[in-house]
Swiss-Prot record:
UniProt entry tagged with the keyword Glycoprotein: no
PANTHER family in the record: EXODEOXYRIBONUCLEASE 7 SMALL SUBUNIT
Protein name: Exodeoxyribonuclease 7 small subunit
Organism: Sodalis glossinidius (strain morsitans)
Location of this chain's protein in the cell: Cytoplasm
Source lineage: Bacteria, Pseudomonadati, Pseudomonadota, Gammaproteobacteria, Enterobacterales
A Pfam family: Exonuc_VII_S
Top-rank lineage group of the source organism: Bacteria
InterPro entries the UniProt entry points to: Exonuc_VII_S, Exonuc_VII_ssu_sf
GO MF annotation list: exodeoxyribonuclease VII activity
Length: 82
């Protein structure tokens, strides 16, 4: 059973960890079970990164609203479990 990875502290940390996983997988030296575990962790990190980027994009869109007099709506990120 694969270990449940803790959430990385930041987007940059998650990206660096994902890059390391890709390097290990591309080496072709991992046993099948370990490669599958690494792949699973990589998918989770990629999804987390994608969600973080989507939230950042939403925040930017709120800040760049075309109507300068429009009140800013507070940003509330979704609390989805990955």
């Amino acid at each position: 059973m694969p270990k449940k990875a803790e959430k990385p502290a930041s987007f940059e940390t998650a990206l660096k960890e994902l890059e390391q996983i890709v390097t290990r997988l591309e080496s072709g030296e991992l046993p099948l079970e370990q490669a599958l575990n690494e792949f699973e962790q990589g998918v989770q990190l990629a999804r987390q990164g994608q969600k973080t980027l989507q939230q950042a994009e939403q925040r930017v869109q709120i800040l760049l609203n075309d109507t300068p007099d429009a009140p800013l709506a507070p940003f509330a990120p979704e609390n989805d479990a990955l």
